[in-house]
Amino acid sequence: MALTNTSIRYGGVTKFFHWLTALLILTLIALGLYASDLPHDTQAALTRKAWLFSLHKTLGVTVFFVALARIVWAFTQPKPGLLNADHRLESWLAETVHWVLYGSLVIVPLAGWINHAAASGFAPIWWPLGQSLPFIPKNTTVEHAFGALHVISGKLLIGALILHIAGAVKHHVVDRDSTLRRMLPGEAVVGPLPAQHHSAAPVITATVVWVAAIAVGLGLGLGLGQQSDQPAPTETAALEDVASDWQVQDGTIALEVTQFGS
């Protein structure tokens, strides 16, 4: 099996990136959903939850760098033609989902990484890169904004992944062509390709989808961040109104905080 792509087949490197990314993404989705639903009412439960989130974050950073390498490789390779290029609507949808997935591989882990860098003290990333990012302050507004973007873009990733898998199954079961087989190990037998129709429409559509998702995610997160930054005036007023004859003459107070993370 050749390492590089041709006009009709995917090479070994592209297949490796494809299946490595698929394994990481499916693992991350399962980890994120499972860890989010775990209780944290005891110290043992909190430690377990934090450990799973550390694993989730560490694999997420891994996906980010794998995605960058995959995208760079893809731009150096010819893209095999579509086997259903003569079905304009279907090929447009397939290409749009393809570009949405590429965006997901960068935006979802990056949003999560920025959310982590802006937060304090929970579930560290295990890569030796530190827990902060340049130009990202420890700030609850930034934390909430990119946390919401991570959730919204993650849902978009799951939706695009479902469509991608459904399309592959349709090609294999209904159309009975080599779309799925040529991404598997070995050399798939591929017949003559139909005439290819190159268009910017899928890229434009995917860009519009991502602009909308980013706007919604950041908008929701900024609203949550501003609410959390506001003090509780009723509690402050209640404390100020408390009358007491106590006076501090002399003494010291020691406070030690241990955080699991940055």
What is each PLM-predicted segment?
Residues 248-262:
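N-terminal glycine/threonine-rich, aromatic-flanked beta-hairpin/loop signature
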Residues 1-237:
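Membrane-embedded alpha-helical bundles that constitute the cytochrome b-like, heme-associated redox core
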Residues 242-245:
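A glycine-anchored, Pro-Gly-centered beta-turn/N-cap motif
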